[in-house]
């Protein structure tokens, strides 16, 4: 598995080099610096090394972002189901992204907020956290706690700009990354 991630990362770096040659991305001292989950990270293009990121999936997401970045802003909120083939992929996304958080925090919404803040999220309503994935892409997770009448649920929204850059699987992986930091 590690080998296939390494191959994908290698191909992404090749694509990134082409983008840099065309002058579409600015670099300084062979490094790219950007915000990722409110943390400043650096990518050394010469060494093909990430400062501050160890996980292969996260490295691939960052490289996909850099390779497919588009100017402009689109903060219209959408869900996974709004994406092409979103309804088809939703059961898989639900089990990978929604269920782990629902099961962990269904009766503990304050701990949900506490953990979200701890990993760099911003509280935007009673049980909602906004996660700035990149400076122009964010996810919102809203927990609906369990009560006497209804089971717990989770709403996940993200700005449309994310769908303009990422494929549905990348967006699902971003959701999984957030979940892995929350559980």
Give, region by region, the residue ranges found by the protein language model.
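Extracellular secretory-pathway ectodomains and N-terminal mature segments of eukaryotic proteins
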Residues: 3-7, 34, 49-52, 145
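Generic recognition of long tandem-repeat/solenoid scaffolds
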Residues: 27-36, 43, 47-52, 127-132, ...
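Short helix-capping/linker segments at secondary-structure and domain boundaries
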Residues: 69-74, 149, 181-183
């Amino acid at each position: 598995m590690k080998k296939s991630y390494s191959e994908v990362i290698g191909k992404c770096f090749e694509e990134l080099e082409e983008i840099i040659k065309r002058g579409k991305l600015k670099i300084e001292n062979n490094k790219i610096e950007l915000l990722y989950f409110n943390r400043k990270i650096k990518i050394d293009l010469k060494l093909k090394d990430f400062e501050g990121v160890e996980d292969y999936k996260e490295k691939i997401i960052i490289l996909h972002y850099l390779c497919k970045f588009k100017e402009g802003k689109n903060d219209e909120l959408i869900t996974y189901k709004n994406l092409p083939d979103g309804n088809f992929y939703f059961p898989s996304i639900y089990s990978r992204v929604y269920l782990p958080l629902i099961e962990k925090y269904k009766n503990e919404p304050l701990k949900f907020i506490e953990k979200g803040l701890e990993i760099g999220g911003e509280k935007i309503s009673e049980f909602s956290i906004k996660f700035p994935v990149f400076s122009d892409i964010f996810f919102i997770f809203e927990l609906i706690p369990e009560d006497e009448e209804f089971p717990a649920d989770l709403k996940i929204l993200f700005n449309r700009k994310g769908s303009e850059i990422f494929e549905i699987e990348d967006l699902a992986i971003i959701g999984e990354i957030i979940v892995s930091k929350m559980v």
